[in-house]
Amino acid sequence: MGRPLTEVKYLLINSAPVILGYALQNSLQTSSVIVTGRLGPSELSVAAFAYMFAMSTGWLIALGGTTAFDTLGSNLWGAGKKQELGILLQTGFIVLSILYLPICLVWWYSKPILIFLHQTPELAEASQKFLRYLIPGGLGYVCFELLKKFLQTQEITRAGSYILLVTSPLNVALNFLLVHYYGLGLKGAPLATGLSYWLSFILLTQYAKYVKGAEAWNGWNKRCLENFGPFVKLSLLGIVMVGTEWWAFEIVALVAGKLGAVPLAAQSVIMTTDQLLNTIPFGLGIITSNRVAYYLGAGLPDNASLTAKVAAIVGVAVGSVIMITMIAVRNIYGRIFTNDPDVIQLVALVMPLVAAFQISDSLNGTMGGALRGTGRQKVGAIVNITAYYLFALPLGIYLAFHGKGLVGLWIGQVIALSIVGILELKIVMATDWISQSRKAISRFGDSSELTALLN
């Protein structure tokens, strides 16, 4: 039992600061929306909608594209190729900056896209202006996330949280200064938040340089321009893997808006809650991915297999705790957000459905992490597309407009996450770990090194 307990301890201890970090990262936007909301309800709507659009597009480059580093970076670290990790970081900066360029165009010309999505011309116009001011800061978000992955790969999991504990309150102050004190209004919010992202990145570089993490950096190297292929491929597949789930939830939000004011308000409460809770399986998934990829790169397939199994058990346990808690507070939870009795009642009605998929969502997080650790982002993307877009979304939308309303939409989401969780669990448990270790080592090592490690 010693080895499994060691893995349980490792996952829990190292995922905790990662989860905290993502919660703080989300708070940068949340606090910006709250500060902007003091201008009025229309400004609140614009800020909330623009950040939602940013999350569904630009932030996918950061949170989906950097999954390539989870795989390749941890393989290198496991194989003891520390200096190669710094070169991979340089490759990541170049690749993700290039991938961010189309996002800049989408944000700059977002008005027709938003009108196509049936948003009002006024909201589309104001959101486009907001997003244009967010473009410079968005690259800071991408760079910060990539540098965090560079440190997490070296098992330095707390650095990002330390930095965000500093920049989160500064972000509130910056938003207040630019939005209200200097009178920039809606323009001030994206500028302030963008400054916070760049400040977070700069402070994290100083942490890596002067505190911990510099041993894997040996200066800029022209080799970072070589062999873009694996990083580009895994980045794009990671974006699709993460994006297909996020887009499905955004589609649910758009459909909920057509069901009326009360369902839309209840959906806003539920989505805000789910986004916060999702940081838990997402954080567990990152540590699982790093651990699995590390063992595969080190030629320890049995350890990688054990980590995946332990991660599945931890995911089920964590999901169960969240599920029980949500069911217990369902009748009073809506009061945190509103005094409207109809909204509170609808939140209480839908909460058991949201609670029902917490175990599946936790499995999705941990098993998705295991898949990324083996470099199989493509498999995760296919599973997500099949579950959400071929089954769950069509069913949920049909039920929503045939008497079930918001409950129908969330029935679809429960089915989707159940399919994803079960399929990914089966795929990971059926993995040929020796074969995956061979692939991991062969990405960066020669055949003699491969034979020596696996023997």
UniProtKB/Swiss-Prot annotation:
The chain crosses the membrane at residues 4-24, 44-64, 87-107, 159-179, 184-204, 236-256, 280-300, 309-329, 343-363, 381-401, 405-425. It comes from the Eukaryota. PANTHER family: MULTIDRUG RESISTANCE PROTEIN (PTHR11206). The keyword Cell membrane does not apply. It is found in: Membrane. Keywords: Membrane, Transmembrane, Transmembrane helix, Transport. This is Uncharacterized transporter C11D3.06. Belongs to the multi antimicrobial extrusion (MATE) (TC 2.A.66.1) family. The lineage of its organism: Eukaryota, Fungi, Dikarya, Ascomycota, Taphrinomycotina. Its main location: membrane. GO terms for molecular function: antiporter activity; transmembrane transporter activity; xenobiotic transmembrane transporter activity. It comes from Schizosaccharomyces pombe (strain 972 / ATCC 24843) (Fission yeast). GO terms for cellular component: fungal-type vacuole membrane; Golgi apparatus; membrane. InterPro entries: MATE_euk, MATE_fam. GO terms for biological process: xenobiotic detoxification by transmembrane export across the plasma membrane. Pfam families: MatE. It is a multi-pass membrane protein. The keyword Cytoplasm does not apply.
